[in-house]
Amino acid sequence: MAPARHRRTGLALPQRARAQSRMKPESWAAPTRAVVPDKDPFYTPRPGFESLAEGTILRSRPVELAAFGLIGLKVRAWQLLYRTTDLNGMPEATVTTVVAPLGGVAPGAPLLSFQCAIDAISPRAFPSYALQRGSRAIGTFAHVELLCFADALTRGWAISIPDHEGMLGAWGAPREPGYRALDGIRAALSFEPGGLDPSAQVGLWGYSGGGLATAWAAEMAPSYAPELDIAGAVLGSPVGDLVSTFHRLNGSLHAGLPMLVVAGLRRVYPAFEELVATHFSDEGRAVLDKAARSTTAAAVMRLARYNVDRHSGTPIAELLAMEAMLAVFADLTLGDRAPTVPLLVVQGVHDQIIAVEDIDALVQRYRDRGAHVTYLRDRGSEHISLLPLSTPLSLNWLADRFAGVAVTPSHTRTVRSVLALPAGSRGLGSLVRSAFRVLFGRPITASATGHGSERTGREARHAA
């Protein structure tokens, strides 16, 4: 049976401040080598952390980041262990990686919370490990995403990159990715060495599995973290309907993705564990266990064309139609709550992983509940290419929100390519230059344009 929906009854802001003062955060030295999170003592909180307020920093350390674990990133970076909340409202701890341009952030700089497409259960895929110098995280997407979100640093923004799946790696679980992202923001804003104003503006961005986590953060923010000044959220190809995605990908080249979701959800939903124990053969359970130890790309390659029916006595259509499964999937579905911040949703019409019809329906659910959604459907991109191609558009849209540029009324627009939009092509050169700096180990500093919007009123009206 699915857990009851958690209703936050957290501490008021003054109580949060008093709670934080009772346990001083520890300052650790920078790690001498990258250690997988489940073997790194930094990730284990001290006893008594449970009574602290959400977002309280438990310990911090400077960290050296690197592209692909090898090419040192010339930025300022720290890891923060902080108190957060799990699916059932219980206290837990996780880590966010806070990154700033090499010269630091200027007064008034915003914070971007970037939710990586972790899309795996193995702690090797957690961004706090994968982005460290010396990590062995072949097959994770964080390194590709780094080439995109590094461009935010050249705008003078700071970035929080949370391990939004938590230490269990429960990919696909609802609500808790949002809690972890929002508490990571709280931690980053209160971390004095980061140089941010505690009341700084915040933007949310994520793609694919990171878009799913970003959607949960946007949905949960009004009730869970109403004090945060979130200017807007960019949802890139989020998972709009998990049941549809299971049916769509089972037996396909990307069949490893739904198997990873099952491996993650069985850790937090008894109904999923019972389904696996009852209906999967020993070989099927072994497939899930091996997937749980794999990075995303490794699982996808290993399980290409895998069909669940091979190792189940019951066809997948019947499994997913069981009453217990329907209750779980209802709990997993986005769109029950209306985000109160403006949303930019970007989706490929011919996406081979996430069906555009599922995102159409998610956008409609949000609008029906009063959310403001700018929805761009891209005819020229598939799932992987849309992230880099939509990066200039995403960052320019967030820059406008930080600058106070008024959003256009909610609308849907289908385009040949997001690069054909003024806000999509502007900034492409900056993206290429920042990716070059990452790949060649050059310093990443804030450019002279700063963190505001460069757009004229006419451009603001016609970009999206």
Question: PLM features: what roles do these ranges have?
Answer:
Residues 108-111, 155-160, 199-201, 229-232, ...:
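Loop/turn elements at helix/coil->beta-strand transitions in domains of secreted/extracellular proteins
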Residues 339, 344-351:
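Short beta-strand/loop motif that positions the catalytic acidic residue
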Residues 186-257:
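Primarily recognizes the serine-hydrolase "nucleophile elbow" in alpha/beta-hydrolase
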Residues 142-148, 171-194, 216:
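Alpha/beta-hydrolase active-site loop
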Residues 2-105:
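Catalytic-loop region of hydrolases
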Residues 86-95, 99-151, 163-165:
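Short, surface-exposed "cap/lid" segments of acyl-processing enzymes
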Residues 322-331, 344, 353, 360-464:
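C-terminal catalytic histidine-bearing segment of alpha/beta-hydrolase fold enzymes
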Residues 239-335:
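Accessory cap/linker subdomain of secreted extracellular hydrolases
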